Amino acid sequence: SEKVKAIIKTLDTPYIIPEGGANALGVLGCEEISNSERNYDIFISACGTGSTLAGIINGMKKNQYAIGFPALKNASFLNDKINCFLNQKNQNWHLELDYHFNGYAKQKPELIKFIQEFWISHGIRLDPVYTAKAMFGLFDLIKNGSLKNKKILFIHTGGLQGVSGFESRYKVVL
């Protein structure tokens, strides 16, 4: 917009961070998540732009695996976006495309119930747009036995600033 351009002109050397941190520096910053001394088997993350997951994949060791849970419906296009950010061809990851709950910022009663029960059981808030969908998916994969005996790191990517608006819009308490 013109207003944004006017503000940028008043700054010496502005650096504009794209939505979702979806650029090479955002991906680089996320490499630190998986590039640690701790040896997790699997990294789990919600996906919006895919840059967090791409960074995690770039930082992984060869024996590690990553699973992303897109918040968007019909998000298979993220496969190509994520591949564009990868340092090398890596097949140790995939997207779980069936946990979007009707799409971005959409909800279903079972997701709301899950968020509420998760808060009561664990004392950790989940946002309904991204993180709750990924956590729900993780619990589902654990239930069906596909992650048995795996050391898992779930990355809570935040999003809590949107909870009050979501509660107001849908007349629910998370």
Region locations from a protein language model:
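Active-site-adjacent helical/loop segments in soluble small-molecule enzymes
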Residues: Y99, G103-N149
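A broadly conserved detector of short glycine/acidic/proline-rich loop/turn motifs that flank catalytic sites
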Residues: G21, Y130, G158-G159
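Nucleotide donor/acceptor-binding cores
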Residues: D41, N149-K150
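Glycine-rich phosphate/pyrophosphate-binding loop at beta-loop-alpha junctions
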Residues: L25-N102, I155-L174
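Generic secondary-structure signature for well-ordered alpha-helical cores
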Residues: K9-T13, N35-N39, N58-K62, C84-Q91, ...
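Small/polar-residue-rich loop-to-helix segments that shape phosphate-bearing ligand pockets
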Residues: S1-N39, Q91-F114
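General beta-strand structural signal in soluble alpha/beta enzymes
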Residues: Y15-E19, F43-S45, L95-E96, I124-P128, ...
